[in-house]
């Protein structure tokens, strides 16, 4: 039943009756034929927009590569469709040609079988550029009737169906891979610019390094180098005054605050320049005290020393005044152990100066005592010459009174000299104590006690020959403040002789 229906349908379709027809062999069976050839082309997909009124082109390349270009209708928007594939030769396949006009049937051999597939270049480009249009293409093709055409075309050959499925699967896999890669790229791209990676431990390492190095060096160096600027220059008086003022008031606080370099340099300059200045300032002050020879002026001298002892700041101001008057300024060479030698040299200079000043004061006192004694002797002689009694007892009483007055004056002068010596010794101890307080961190703490003791010993050694010399030069008064017997006897003899002369 099925066969008859197919035959009937084929006979009806070709308009062939049940009669027997003659079959002719075509030119392809002729071995000398070189101009006629028949080929078959199988497409995996034929779009509905193909324009059948125009000719297609076939290009055969090397290695049996074939490119078929089929024109499309103008309404499709695509000028042509390109197919690419390969060819292979037939061995036993033939082609039967039926001529409707004559009714003749001819058999021809097939030379090559060409199988091509539609290239996905344009479609892939569209999928990459405009993915929305590719999603809408199956609906348009279904509306135009292209989808039913695509279904039976794979049925023409057994090998074309898996190829079509593979092609669609490849496209889907490509889109999946592309979307997956895009998602992966987006996932990888977000952490790169995300704040989580900015706060990662790899980047804060240089951020933590820069604050640890920069403030430690800049702050410490600035604090250590700034105070040393006025100490370097020799001509800067303002820097020296500031250094002396700071050393006089806050050396101990500066060293306790953690600046040993500044305290040591300022104190060293204070000591070095304090000991350079006294040749001018201290000498002038001693000359001023020597000029005030009366006892009242000498009594003012201990009061000045007492004021200097009570107010340490006045002594520092006097030292600054002496430093301004001093023409020589030396740079402090002292860092470390080099301070011990200049201190010993300066201390010896101060001892010499103080000894000279004490010697000058003692000489002035000797001159005053000598003048007072000469005046008393002259007055006693005048009194003895004017007296008419002539008695030795009256002369002796007058001489005793004059000698007692001189002894009292001499005792007062000795007490004043002793007070001057004690006040001077006290001020020297005060200066030594100030030096000891100003040098807490120089390692010179052991020098100041030795300095005070050596100062006292040297002063005592220098005062002993001076006292001996004073005793030898004076020779006028005894050790207890009175006059010796020889002088009294000579005075009595002179008074008696003068009285005898008056009697004669």
UniProtKB/Swiss-Prot annotation:
Composition skew (Low complexity), residue ranges: 200-213, 304-334, 404-438, 455-473, 488-498
Principal place of residence: nucleus
Single GO molecular function: transcription elongation factor activity
Compositionally biased intervals (Acidic residues): 383-398
Biased composition (Polar residues): 174-184, 248-271
Phosphoserine modification, residue list: 194
Alphabetically ordered keywords of this record: Activator, Developmental protein, Nucleus, Phosphoprotein, Transcription, Transcription regulation
One Pfam family recorded for the sequence: EAF
Signal peptide annotation: none
Annotated GO biological process: cellular response to heat; positive regulation of DNA-templated transcription; transcription elongation by RNA polymerase II; wound healing
Region Disordered: start-end pairs: 174-218, 242-504
Compartment(s) of residence: Nucleus
Family: Belongs to the EAF family.
Protein's job: Promotes transcriptional elongation by Su(Tpl)/ELL. Essential for development.
Assembly and binders: Component of the little elongation complex, at least composed of Ell, Eaf, Ice1 and Ice2.
The protein's name in its UniProt record: Ell-associated factor Eaf
Protein source organism: Drosophila melanogaster (Fruit fly)
């Amino acid at each position: 039943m099925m066969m008859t229906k197919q035959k009937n349908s084929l006979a009806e379709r070709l308009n062939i009756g049940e009669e027997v027809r003659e079959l002719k062999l075509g030119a392809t069976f002729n071995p000398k034929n070189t101009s006629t050839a028949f080929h078959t082309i199988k497409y995996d997909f034929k779009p509905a927009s193909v324009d059948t009124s125009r000719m297609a082109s076939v290009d055969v390349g090397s290695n049996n590569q074939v490119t078929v270009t089929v024109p499309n209708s103008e309404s499709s928007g695509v000028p042509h469709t390109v197919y690419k594939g390969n060819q292979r030769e037939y061995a036993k396949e033939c082609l039967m040609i039926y001529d409707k006009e004559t009714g003749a049937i001819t058999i021809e051999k097939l030379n090559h079988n060409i199988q091509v597939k539609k290239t996905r270049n344009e479609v892939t480009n569209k999928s990459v550029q405009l993915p929305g249009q590719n999603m809408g293409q199956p609906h348009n093709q279904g509306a135009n009737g292209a989808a039913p055409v695509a279904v039976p075309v794979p049925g023409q050959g057994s090998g074309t169906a898996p190829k079509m499925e593979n092609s669609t699967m490849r496209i889907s896999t490509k889109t999946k891979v592309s979307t997956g890669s895009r998602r992966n790229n987006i996932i990888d791209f977000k952490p790169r610019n995300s704040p989580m990676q900015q706060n990662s431990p790899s980047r804060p390492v240089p951020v933590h390094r820069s604050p640890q190095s920069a403030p430690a060096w800049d702050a410490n160096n600035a604090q250590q180098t700034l105070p040393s600027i006025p100490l370097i220059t020799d001509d800067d008086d303002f820097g020296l005054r500031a250094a002396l003022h700071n050393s006089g008031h806050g050396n101990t606080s500066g060293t306790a605050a953690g600046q040993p370099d500044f305290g040591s340099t300022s104190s060293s300059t204070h000591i070095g320049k304090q000991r350079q200045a006294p040749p001018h300032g201290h000498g002038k002050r001693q000359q001023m005290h020597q000029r005030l020879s009366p006892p009242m002026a000498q009594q003012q001298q201990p009061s000045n020393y007492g004021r200097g002892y009570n107010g340490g700041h006045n002594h520092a101001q006097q030292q600054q005044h002496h430093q301004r008057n001093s023409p020589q300024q030396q740079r402090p060479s002292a860092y470390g152990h080099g301070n011990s030698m200049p201190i010993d040299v300066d201390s010896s200079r101060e001892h010499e100066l103080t000894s000279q000043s004490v010697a000058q004061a003692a000489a002035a006192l000797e001159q005053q005592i000598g003048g007072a004694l000469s005046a008393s002797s002259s007055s006693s002689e005048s009194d003895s010459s004017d007296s008419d009694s002539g008695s030795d007892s009256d002369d002796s009483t007058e001489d005793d009174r004059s000698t007692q007055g001189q002894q009292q004056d001499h005792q007062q002068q000795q007490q004043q000299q002793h007070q001057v010596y004690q006040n001077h010794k006290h001020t020297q101890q005060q200066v030594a104590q100030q030096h000891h307080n100003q040098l807490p961190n120089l390692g010179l703490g052991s020098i100041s006690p030795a300095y005070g003791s050596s100062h006292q010993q040297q002063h005592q050694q220098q005062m002993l020959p001076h006292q001996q010399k004073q005793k030898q030069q004076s020779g006028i008064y005894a050790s207890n403040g009175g006059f010796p017997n020889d002088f009294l006897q000579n005075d009595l003899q002179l008074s008696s002789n003068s009285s005898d002369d008056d009697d004669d």
